[in-house]
Regions:
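Short, well-ordered alpha-helical segments
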Residues: 95, 99, 170-177
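Short, gly/Ser/Thr-rich active-site loops of penicillin-recognizing serine hydrolases
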Residues: 80-82, 173-186
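A short acidic/glycine-rich loop-to-helix N-cap element
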Residues: 160-174
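Beta-lactam-recognizing serine transpeptidase/beta-lactamase-like catalytic domain environment
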Residues: 1-160
Length: 186
């Protein structure tokens, strides 16, 4: 599990011209710690950017791309001065594994807890997640996904912090749906 996390960039600095927090996946864990870490507990640290990049890699057949904060630079009359080209960062997993995970993510939106992220007429791939954050009974609620699943145009990650489980899942999937609809003009 640690090697897979590293393959998706956990514990590595993102080389982008912006200060961002580094995600981490602990090493040298006991079996019980590894079990907790495998579902995002124990001492796993991540950011919405890292989670969105992971979903984007699944959408892209296992290839993770370097994130860009802007697509192009335009002049005052809106002609393109410079356009950034997509740049491969790493191969995170095989196409076979990425395709299987994609199928599971589509099923999670079509038939599972992530159904709130569904967009009419669009096949959406997504996954919810809940991270316990202490003894308060509150959690961090996540949704990540991409759409359209068969020809991805957008990959996202949404997190609501310090929230109860049922409210968090509803809010995070609804926010995902709204992002998909806005970008895909639905």
């Amino acid at each position: 599990i640690s090697r897979t996390a590293e393959n998706f960039g956990y514990g590595q600095d993102l080389k982008i011209p912006l200060a961002v927090a580094k995600s981490s996946f602990p090493k040298g864990m006991s079996q019980s710690q590894l079990a907790q870490a495998s579902v995002g507990q124990y001492d796993v640290r991540t950011t919405p950017l890292q989670v969105a990049m992971t979903s984007a890699a699944i959408a892209n057949g296992g290839v993770q791309m370097k994130p860009n904060m802007i697509r192009s630079v335009k002049t005052s009359n809106l002609s393109v001065l410079y356009e950034f080209s997509p740049e491969k960062l790493r191969t995170s997993t095989s196409t076979k594994v990425a395709d299987q995970v994609k199928q599971w993510m589509v099923n999670s939106v079509d038939n599972g807890i992530a159904s709130g992220a569904g967009v009419s007429g669009v096949k959406v791939a997504g996954k919810t997640g809940t991270a316990e954050i202490g003894t308060t009974g509150l959690n961090n609620s996540w949704f990540t996904g991409f759409a359209p699943a068969d020809d991805p145009k957008i990959a996202i990650a949404v997190v609501y912090e310090d929230i109860d489980v049922s409210t968090g899942a509803k809010l995070s999937t609804n926010a995902g749906k709204q992002l998909f609809e806005a970008v895909l003009n639905k």
